[in-house]
């Protein structure tokens, strides 16, 4: 938990603090401005897997058929592994011509390439390695990304927000007490709306001391996701 106190209004002069106070609409009388920030850590409980499959053929329909067959094979694999069909998306498809360029600079149609993207929402992280292996066995050419996340991010967002609020209040109370004045009511609040893009912190899995060989699952990285928030509050002061 982190908290930064900007300053007492009487101490604020120029630069970023002055602009910050103006944005927060400070009163003419004695007041104090605090900026509360908080960070909440969450352990991922889900992952979004993105794969790409592509195939080339003389005919566009043949290339599409090859891609569709690979995707269908992976769909069957996912169903056998208990993945809800609603957590699978592969509706997008595009085809493009492929050209072969001659030494004289001219191009000749070589064939067509079909591409589909498959996205899977995985809610059981212990199946992560299995689903990655299954995709490669189904000839899905590319593993584009593996993004870890949490199923209910709003819970962590709200917790971070409430912690930032409490810290802003706590700092204001501490400052008022230290300067021998009474903390009055809130005059204004400036909330720094966050995009809430969790920042991952990498932690390597540790192999068991007695293990002679590291398992494949242990080579993947576990993340701690940080949800940060900030609120700026102006309080009135009285003697």
Swiss-Prot record:
InterPro entries: 26kDa_periplasmic_antigen, SIMPL/DUF541
Phylogenetic placement of the source organism: Bacteria, Pseudomonadati, Pseudomonadota, Gammaproteobacteria, Enterobacterales
Protein name per UniProt: Uncharacterized protein YggE
Gene Ontology biological process: DNA damage response
Superkingdom, taxonomy of origin: Bacteria
UniProt organism field: Edwardsiella ictaluri (strain 93-146)
Protein's gene: yggE
